[in-house]
UniProtKB/Swiss-Prot annotation:
<feature type="short sequence motif" description="DEAH box">
    <location>
        <begin position="185"/>
        <end position="188"/>
    </location>
</feature>
<dbReference type="InterPro" id="IPR011709">
    <property type="entry name" value="DEAD-box_helicase_OB_fold"/>
</dbReference>
<dbReference type="GO" id="GO:0003724">
    <property type="term" value="F:RNA helicase activity"/>
</dbReference>
<keyword id="KW-0007">Acetylation</keyword>
<dbReference type="Pfam" id="PF07717">
    <property type="entry name" value="OB_NTP_bind"/>
</dbReference>
<comment type="similarity">
    <text>Belongs to the DEAD box helicase family. DEAH subfamily.</text>
</comment>
<dbReference type="GO" id="GO:0005739">
    <property type="term" value="C:mitochondrion"/>
</dbReference>
<feature type="domain" description="Helicase ATP-binding">
    <location>
        <begin position="72"/>
        <end position="238"/>
    </location>
</feature>
<dbReference type="GO" id="GO:0004386">
    <property type="term" value="F:helicase activity"/>
</dbReference>
<feature type="region of interest" description="Disordered">
    <location>
        <begin position="1"/>
        <end position="28"/>
    </location>
</feature>
<dbReference type="InterPro" id="IPR014001">
    <property type="entry name" value="Helicase_ATP-bd"/>
</dbReference>
<dbReference type="GO" id="GO:0005681">
    <property type="term" value="C:spliceosomal complex"/>
</dbReference>
<feature type="binding site">
    <location>
        <begin position="85"/>
        <end position="92"/>
    </location>
    <ligand>
        <name>ATP</name>
    </ligand>
</feature>
<keyword id="KW-0347">Helicase</keyword>
<dbReference type="InterPro" id="IPR007502">
    <property type="entry name" value="Helicase-assoc_dom"/>
</dbReference>
<keyword id="KW-0496">Mitochondrion</keyword>
<dbReference type="GO" id="GO:0005524">
    <property type="term" value="F:ATP binding"/>
</dbReference>
Length: 743
């Protein structure tokens, strides 16, 4: 948590002083006396500004405000307090401020306040909003911490952070002694990090009786929390507003036409208000966006129809109220927001009067048997539908259009959103739990216990990556791997790059695959132009090398440009995502700092030489030897080495563009879906694979033609040592099973 990151927005090392009151002109004494009558801010000792009082009136109108006295009483008398409230009741901004007041009242003797969020965008926006409401500087009294960006000082009283950042802080500060109050917000999202924190904090609370834990949740999860934590006080915030809910009378196969018809009917009705549409996946956003855009000017007398696509998985802006300049615009604008699941947190505007919900989502569900995500279409939960309805906020005339029947809502939708821990790859979580065990906190009482099969797969993968010793504890490799805020496979590749003298290049690859997609969404009709631009960066050795080429071109442009505008224009011209490349730059700098901090060797860059290319592939194989595929028929049908799934190269792969399909590839991602694409692929040779793959992993591979080919490679490389290798495999396999127990 102490790493340096990006500079804080609007932060300044200078304090605010009252205007002209300290001048040496005549009448100074009267002005200073007048200032003495002003109410002082207890957090920085300066007089409150007029804006503070304006915002205070807005805060007092929030539904949560009437519960302040009850909350403060319960905070004084209890170690755990649960706050139950709807999305727009104000709990995420007000409860942390009240906790800061509590810590101030006891002179911070137990520490400050930290409040977790699931999403990065809300962390930053809440910190900015709360600093404004408290009349203090962002980055000083109030700050935030998100991956690769730290906007706090040692004097920060109230911190907002993502849940995974607080989890990482526990590696070095397991009992979180810097904080007197910990707030877990939006736990109904059921992210892995939040569920882990809920379990670990039970032990921390026992070790630190003075610590306070506040849990903010939607009402749907309260009964489960009560059974999990026992008899703890619950502050219920009432925020009921009449909303007209409209269901379909009968099920429809295709919701696309219904969505478009509803959007244009609402617009033609003349009723004022913005529209939010929840779609199943990002491809649907692009499809609806294009169609609505084409029909947005059919009737200009009704005002402009502005399409706003919001992609929750990318670093996109929040949907906020119009500023004063936009409000004064003569032409009425109706905004149509298109988003997907988890897009609820991006909607911060009270101008929404209509919500259209398709009722289904495309979810990633991890299959530990084949080590791959499946993209499945599933109904959303009843709690998700309720949260979407709450976007209408205080609107007395809001309408919630459900593109499904009432029977579907009651029978097909589950009451609660599934916990991510039960549907995701747990390898990173298990690595963290093993690291915490070193710090003395190995037990974790999960609210929903993960599937034993998922835990076994995670332990097995860590064992293959040499992250565990013979007793099942973290090895030296494992301890160093846990220092990187990356997937364990990527961390292992970085460690291997130190051995193979290609740290500079592998850090670039790690940053590029961790940042959002560097390729922009291409407008309809510009596909050929985009492909032509992207071809300039293609590297013959594969997509990992192409990512290095793109990053280096971005770096050169940044160094040689006179302004940010020139860099942004260059990105637009080449259909590249400028914010994603900026983020990759920040991530790379952070990873380099970790390399230096733990004193790992760092070789000078040598990108382009044959030796360097081979070394990069060795480093990648050291982490991703479990993600190998072979073209079985010469036409681009790739069979996974670990199972019998067949996949194709992604259309944006350099090999797809050049139509040159290598026989063996290493890939970064694979998801089972309609197209079964493998993403970010680079050619490897079977000889190189067999030199680097752990022998006990190879012995556990299922029988296949690919395994037979690799065995022939082994026999050809070292026929004499085959018997010794087989003996080593047999000796290693039993140990592997014994090591794979969560201790």
């Amino acid at each position: 948590m102490e790493e340096e990151g990006l500079e804080c927005p609007n932060s300044s090392s200078e304090k605010r002083y009252f205007p002209e009151s300290l001048d040496s002109s005549d009448g100074d004494e009267e002005e200073v006396l007048a200032c003495e009558d002003l109410e002082l801010n207890p957090f920085d000792g300066l007089p409150y500004s007029s804006r503070y009082y304006k915002l205070l009136k807005e805060r007092e109108d929030l539904p949560i405000w009437k519960e302040k006295y009850s909350f403060m009483e319960n905070l004084l008398q209890n170690q755990i307090v649960i706050v139950s409230g709807d999305a727009k009741c104000g709990k995420s901004a007000q409860v942390p401020q009240w906790c800061a007041e509590y810590c101030l009242s006891i002179h911070y003797q137990h520490g400050g306040v930290i409040c977790t969020q699931v999403h990065k965008q809300t962390v930053v926006q809440l910190a900015l909003r709360v600093a404004d409401e408290m009349d203090v500087n962002i980055g000083h009294e109030v700050g935030y911490v998100i991956p690769f960006e730290n906007c706090c000082t040692n004097e920060t009283i109230l911190r907002y952070c993502t849940d995974d950042m607080l989890q990482r802080e526990m590696m070095s500060n397991p009992f979180l002694g810097s904080y007197g109050v910990i707030i877990l917000d939006d736990i109904h999202e059921r992210s892995i990090a939040t569920d882990v924190l809920l379990g670990l904090l039970k032990d921390v609370l026992l070790a630190r009786p003075e610590l306070k834990l506040i849990i903010n949740s939607s009402p749907h999860l309260i009964s489960k929390l009560n059974s999990y934590y026992g008899n703890v006080p619950v502050i219920e915030v009432k925020n009921k507003h009449p909303v007209e809910v409209v269901y379909l009378s009968e099920a429809q196969k295709d919701s696309f036409e219904s969505i478009l018809r509803l959007i244009f009917e609402i617009h033609h009705s003349g009723e004022k208000g913005d529209i939010v549409v929840f779609l199943a996946c990002e491809q649907d956003i692009e499809k609806v966006c294009e169609t609505v855009y084409q029909g947005s000017n059919l009737n200009p007398d009704l005002g402009e129809l502005v399409v706003v696509p919001l992609y929750p998985k990318e670093k996109c802006s929040l949907f906020k109220p119009l500023d004063e300049t936009e409000k004064r615009c003569q032409v009425y604008q109706r905004r149509v927001v298109l988003t997907t699941s988890s897009g609820e947190f991006l909607i911060w505007s009270n101008s929404v009067r209509f919500v259209i919900d398709v009722g289904v989502e495309r979810r990633k569900v991890y299959n530990p048997r084949i080590r791959a995500n499946s993209l499945v279409m599933q109904p959303i939960s009843q709690s998700q539908a309720e949260i979407r309805k709450q976007i209408l906020g205080s609107s007395s005339s809001g309408k919630f259009f459900c593109l499904y029947t009432e029977e579907f809502a009651s029978k097909d939708m589950t009451p609660l959103k599934p916990a991510e821990m039960q549907e995701a790859n747990l390898t990173s979580m298990v690595l963290f739990m093993k690291r915490i065990d070193i710090a003395g906190l190995g037990h974790c009482d999960f609210m929903n216990r993960p599937a034993p099969e998922s835990l076994m797969q995670a332990l097995e993968d860590l064992d293959y990556l040499a992250a565990l010793d013979n007793d099942g504890n973290l090895s030296e490799f494992g301890i160093i791997m846990s220092e990187f805020p990356l997937d364990p496979q990527l961390s292992k590749s970085i460690l291997a790059s130190c051995e193979f003298d290609c740290v500079d290049e592998v850090l670039t690859i790690a940053a590029m695959v961790t940042a959002p997609n560097c390729f922009s969404h291409v407008p309809h009709g510009a596909e050929e132009a985009a492909l032509t631009c992207w071809k300039t960066f293609l590297h013959p050795e594969g997509d990992h090398f192409t990512l290095i080429s793109i990053y280096k071109a971005y770096q050169d442009t940044t160094l040689n440009s006179s302004s940010e505008y020139c860099v942004e224009k260059w990105c637009r011209d080449y259909f590249l995502n400028c914010s994603a490349l900026r983020m990759a730059d920040v991530i790379r700098a952070e990873l380099l700092e970790i390399i230096k901090r733990i004193e790992l060797p760092y070789a000078e860059p040598a990108f382009g030489s044959k030796e360097n290319t081979l070394n990069i592939k060795k480093a990648l194989l050291s982490g991703y030897f479990m993600q190998i595929a072979r073209d079985v028929d010469g036409s681009g049908n790739y069979l996974m080495l670990t199972h019998k799934q067949v996949a194709q190269l992604h259309p944006l792969s350099g090999y797809s563009i050049t139509k040159k399909m290598p026989e063996w590839v290493l890939f970064h991602k694979f998801s089972i879906s309609e197209n079964n694409y493998i993403r970010i692929t680079s050619e490897i040779s079977p000889e190189l694979f067999m030199q680097l793959v752990p022998q006990y992993y190879f012995s556990n591979l299922p029988p296949s033609e690919s395994k037979d080919i690799l065995q022939q490679v082994v026999d050809h490389l070292s026929p004499v040592s085959t018997m010794n290798k087989e003996q080593q495999m047999c000796e290693t396999c039993p140990e592997t099973e014994q090591r794979c127990t969560l201790q």
